Amino acid sequence: MKVTFSLMQKASKQIDKFALYVPKSGVFPKGFKVATQATGVKKNGNLDLGIIRNVNTSRPSSAAAVFTTNKFKAAPVLVSKEVLEVTGGENVDAIVVNSGCANAVTGEVGLKDAREIAGVANQNLGKQNATLVMSTGVIGQRLSMDKIVPALSQQFETNAFKDDFESWLNLARAISTTDTFPKLISSNFKLANGTEYTLTGIAKGAGMICPNMATLLGFIVTDLPITPSALQKMLRSATDRSFNCISVDGDMSTNDTISMLANGAVDTAVIDENSQDFVQVQTQVTEFAQRLAQLVVRDGEGSTKFVTVNVKNALNFKDAKIIAESISNSMLVKTALYGQDANWGRILCAIGYAKLDNLQSLDDKKINVSFVATDNSEPKELKLIVDGVPQLDIDEARASELLAQQDLEVLVDLGTGSEECQFWTCDLTHEYVTINGDYRS
């Protein structure tokens, strides 16, 4: 299907994502404060430095993180990994993030710069190994330390840390690069004993997003008391079903980091892997992380559609995820969705070349593929393949209606088991090429 001028016009119309996805208020965990500043690293003068600080002293904090699998790990990734290895995740009280420069592929000098930033924060906290560092932006350039270090010191010296909504929103702004809106969510939850706690999440990312994370930074903070090992297990599981289940363009970056801090400001028993509350909190953190990860896809560079790829009835979760990932990363599928073309052949092709662990997960006589409406319109499901047989009499008018929607679900029923994976992706447009062609300029 050729992309018509009318389709290009439609894609060029800007969706007001800020109005749709940015909150106007929020609830935030006890004992955390944040600060931001425009240091001048970003050419446009926008906020480019952010700090999260734990100010609760009632008990030790815990930290956890999941990092990129890219072989060329950026300096801040290596330094943050060192901090967690040395401390075991105990008594980490701050995260310092800069945007505009990734401090990636910068060699020993990059490591020195990342350690210096952490050292400035540690000195002001009065502790060693108490700070995680993150960077995002252009790869291969050294940090402007003459701008970042004085600005970081100033935040501590002037006690610029606050805990109000606007300050948290500014933190989300400070870590943005090609993002069209700041990504901030927060929610209250209750434990079985009635104790209320809060999760706040911030993320950045709009391009170089694919499984095992990409140019993606995110952090979740909570006032629950959780042991470091339980927090790491919780975050790892949540990440596998959230940030590792999203794709914008299939590119994996050098800087991905998802971190989590728990400061124990809520007065309740410390949660470990054997606690009765562990499974409940893990489920809540996973669902929360999925909400945050979905915002990254909704901000996919140049995208016009948010697509849920739901693979169900697989032999195991891993194979369901492999197939969902294969569909989500297919350039041909993504461009067909942009062109509003019900090209089921591209979906089937992506399923067929998925590198499954167990070939019995896929039976070409059992597979079903459908488009599913995400609104209340009927018929809700448009079947494209039934028990391995392509449907030659597809209702093209209904297909056009579904593909014109901003939210769409692709449902794949493998019919070989009972496991399921949801993956989130977007279409690929002319605007994506424009944004990335002009990135450094």
UniProtKB/Swiss-Prot annotation:
Pathway it works in: Amino-acid biosynthesis; L-arginine biosynthesis; L-ornithine and N-acetyl-L-glutamate from L-glutamate and N(2)-acetyl-L-ornithine (cyclic): step 1/1; Amino-acid biosynthesis; L-arginine biosynthesis; N(2)-acetyl-L-ornithine from L-glutamate: step 1/4
Active site, UniProt feature: 215 (nucleophile)
Binding site for substrate: 177, 204, 215, 301, 436, 441
Keyword Amino-acid biosynthesis (UniProt): yes
GO CC terms in record: mitochondrial matrix
Classification of source organism: Eukaryota, Fungi, Dikarya, Ascomycota, Saccharomycotina
Organism: Kluyveromyces lactis (strain ATCC 8585 / CBS 2359 / DSM 70799 / NBRC 1267 / NRRL Y-1140 / WM37)
Site (Involved in the stabilization of negative charge on the oxyanion by the formation of the oxyanion hole): 136-137
Additional observations: This protein may be expected to contain an N-terminal transit peptide but none has been predicted.
Gene3D superfamilies documented for this protein: arginine biosynthesis bifunctional protein suprefamily, ArgJ beta chain, C-terminal domain, L-amino peptidase D-ALA esterase/amidase
NCBIfam families to which the protein is assigned, alphabetical: ArgJ, PRK05388.1
Subunit structure and binding partners: Heterodimer of an alpha and a beta chain.
EC identifiers of the protein: 2.3.1.35, 2.3.1.1
Catalytic reactions of this protein: N(2)-acetyl-L-ornithine + L-glutamate = N-acetyl-L-glutamate + L-ornithine; L-glutamate + acetyl-CoA = N-acetyl-L-glutamate + CoA + H(+)
Function: Catalyzes two activities which are involved in the cyclic version of arginine biosynthesis: the synthesis of acetylglutamate from glutamate and acetyl-CoA, and of ornithine by transacetylation between acetylornithine and glutamate.
HAMAP family with a match to the protein in the record: ArgJ
InterPro entries, per database record: Arg_biosynth_ArgJ, ArgJ-like_dom_sf, ArgJ_beta_C
Protein name per the record: Arginine biosynthesis bifunctional protein ArgJ, mitochondrial
PANTHER family the record matches: ARGININE BIOSYNTHESIS BIFUNCTIONAL PROTEIN ARGJ, ARGININE BIOSYNTHESIS BIFUNCTIONAL PROTEIN ARGJ, MITOCHONDRIAL
GO MF annotations, alphabetized: glutamate N-acetyltransferase activity; L-glutamate N-acetyltransferase activity
Family to which the UniProt record says this protein belongs: Belongs to the ArgJ family.
Domain of life, source organism: Eukaryota
Site (Cleavage): 214-215
PTM: The alpha and beta chains are autoproteolytically processed from a single precursor protein within the mitochondrion.
One GO-annotated biological process of the protein: ornithine biosynthetic process
Places the protein is found: Mitochondrion matrix
